[in-house]
Structure formats: structure tokens, C-alpha cells
Amino acid sequence: MLNPLRHSSLRSFHDGLMRLVVLAGIVLAAPLLTPGRPVAQQKPLHLNPVIAKLAEGKTVYGLNTGDLSLVYAREVARAPVDFIYADLEHNPLDFPALHMFLMGMTDKATILKKGNLQPNVALFARFPPEADQSQWVVKQALDIGLHGVIFNGVDTKEQALFAVKTMRYPQLKGSKIYQPAGIRGAGPANATWLWGISGDEYERHADLWPLNPEGDLLAMLMIESVEGLENLDAIASTPGVGALFLGVGNDLTHSMGVRPGSPEVEVGFQKVLSACKAHKIACAITANTANDLAKRVKEGWNIIRSTVPVITAGRALLGER
């Protein structure tokens, strides 16, 4: 025989539970039902870890190399850095080796642990041709799957504009960022394989940041001459330029006719930094010691090229983890 008291208690419990479910549904649905109240949307994931950090206002640290061995590729993939660039200007121009190096940096264990397709370390490259002669190497580099290109010897706005165009696909009609009009040819099968996305997805990601806030390619222009310093504002203001880059400054000192370490060189460095800040693009420099690294970061440089020991020690001086 059914116990009426027990039946009443069960019914009360059931009714109470249903009220909680309905209330929870109302609370969860409230943002959708409230007129004029936008629903927060998750930001799209940048597949370029350097851009992901720069977009958040962080400093990024990296290396350069001429060693394109698979052994070093595996080492770099787990190094405590954000990028590495292959220096193919002062080392043999070897695209098959560059391709294998990028494949060697593909760390499936890290991808699985991270839970998304963003690598820990981005790969850029620097090539022999000057900026206005670089279309063919840029096409090769991006179709291999690189995350960005460092252009040598950018002296004028025209050279900067051409560099940008070589990295962009032609845009769809009606695009708000149609210009600068891209001239990159379509054929990124190797890149899509390494990025782990479809061709359509790759075309959405393969645009220049910060011109396209969702872009994952970075155009970095090296200032290496007095002429480049004279045209800094015109170069830095070119839409699509992501960063200005200074190496150790040897070519710049040669152009100035002075020795490394001369005061004129540092004045030139500071002009580059000021132009980057004025036009809200990233600014890259080389640091040879931990103290130099800390000094440059405090000045506002947000892309630092050095070595792992210097980066580790410099970040410790800055109180960074």
C-alpha cells in the first residue's frame, strides 16, 4: 500500500526540483532575452603564438638560427621562447631544409596537451633578396607554412608596400581591408597540412596582423640604412606592416659610416622605437646580455631576439615567469 506521507514528500521534492530547473533556465537565458544586451563572444584563437601575445600587449622572445637540422627543430619546439627565425640571408638558401625544419617542429604531444592547434614556437625566416625583390621567396616561405617573413633593407614606403602585398591574398569584393591589394598566389597545401586546417580556414588566418585583427601572419621590416631612418614614418605607417626589426645593427653602422656602439647608432635605434610606438606596431631588437634585454623591454621594445640563457636571465631581472 502506498504511503501517502512518503508520496507527498516525493511530490514536493519533484515540484521543488522542477522549480529550480526552470529558475536556472531563466538565469542562463537572461543574457539572450535582455533587449540591447550583447552576448559575450569568445575571441578567435590566433594560430600564431607571437601574434596571440602581442595582441594581449605582451613581450615576445625568440632566437635566430642557421641550423636547420631535425635534431635542433625538436629542441626548439620545446624551448622557452615564442619564436625562432631562420637566417637564410647569411646562410645557404635551402627551402627543402626549411620545410623539413618546420615539420620537425611539429610537436604532437604538445598539441595534444595544449588542446588546440597553436604551436608554442612560431617560425619566421629572413631571406637574401631586398624587400622589393622578394616576391618569389615570400611565396615559397608562406606556402611551406611559415608564420611570418623578415624583409631585409627596407628603405622606402614603396618597398614596404610591396612587401605587404606579397604576403596577402587578393581580398573578397566588399572587404573593409581590401587594400593593400594582395598578390600572393593560391596553393597552400603544405601550409594547411602543417597548420592542421582546411584551405578555406587557412585563407582566413593567412592575412597580416594587425591590419586584419584575426590575421596570423607577421610582416617584419628591417631598417638597415640612413635612408630607412629618414623614411621611418612612411614605412611604419604602411598598412599591413606588423613590426620594424633591428638586428645587431652592423648594416646600419656601415650605412652611417661609424663603428658599432657609436652614439649615432643608438639615436637611430630610438628613432625606430618612436616610430613603432607612434604607429602602434611592434618593435624588434637584438639583446646580447640580460641587462640589455631588461633595458630594452623597459624602453618599450616588445620583440626581443637573443639566446635562451640571456632570455631566461633577462626575464628573471624583469620579474617575468
Give the label of every model feature segment:
Residues 1-18:
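N-terminal secretory signal peptides that target proteins for export/translocation
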Residues 19-34:
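Bacterial N-terminal signal peptides
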Residues 38-321:
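Expand to "…catalyze enediolate/carbanion chemistry for C-C bond making/breaking, isomerization
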